[in-house]
Amino acid sequence: MTGYKDVMSHAEPDYCAEQRELIARLEQDLRVQLAHKQHRLAHSLSVASCAEGLALLYGVDPYKARLAGILHDWEKALTGEKIVARARELGIDMGVDLELVAPLLHGIVAARELPARYPEVPPEVWHAVKVHTTAAPQMSPLDMVLFVADGIEPLRPKTPGIEASRALVGSTALADLFWESFVGGIIYVLKGSRYLWPGTIDTYNRLAAARERAGAL
C-alpha cells in the first residue's frame, strides 16, 4: 500500500478464528446499538476499515485498529444531554462544565463503561477510544491511527483540510499525519467559533514543544 486509495481498498488481514468472531460480534452489537442512527453506524464501520488499512500501512496492529474503529462512537447512540449526564454519573472531570465539552465525551464514557462488557478487548484499544476526540500529549501509534481514521474515512466530505490529510497518507510518517489531522481539527473548531477545550490547547502546546525538540518543525 502506498496511499489513501490503497488504504481504503486493502484486503482483510488473515485473522484467526477468535479474532474474526470478536469482530463479527462487535459489529453486530454495534448495529443494534446504532440501529436508529444509520449514518453513525456507517461512519463507525468506515472508520474501522480505514483504521485497519492505516495500521497495515504504518506497521500497527490492524486487529486492534479495527476493534477501536468499531467501538469509537458507541456512545453516540445517546443524545448529547444523556452523554453529559452519564459522564457526571461516572465522575468524569474535564476541568470545565461538561456541557461545554459534550462533543468530546462519548469516547471517554465508552472507555469507562465498555471494558466490563467486552473484557477480551485489549486495554490499548480502550485508550485509543478514550483519546480519539481529545488527543493526548502521549499518543501511541494505535491512538494516532484511530484519530486520523476518524477524520479521513471516505464518508467524510471532501473539504480542503480533509483532502490535504488524505493526500499525506503513505507519503509522511504517522506522527506527522496525526499532527496535521489534529491541527486541522483545531482550525475547524476555531473557524466555526466553537468552544475550544483548554485541554486541547495544553495538548497542542506539549505536542508542539515535543516536535520542536525532535526537529520536526
Q: What is each PLM-predicted segment?
A:
Residues I187-L217:
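Charged phosphate-binding loop/patch that engages nucleotide di/tri-phosphates or the phosphate backbone
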Residues Q28-L34, H43, E52, L56-W179:
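Divalent metal-dependent catalytic cores for phosphoryl transfer on phosphate-bearing substrates
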Residues F182-G185:
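C-terminal beta-signal and terminal closure region of outer-membrane beta-barrel proteins
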Residues E12-Q19, S171, A175, S193:
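Intrinsic-disorder-associated interaction segments
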Residues T2-H36:
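Generic N-terminal amphipathic, Lys/Arg-enriched alpha-helix
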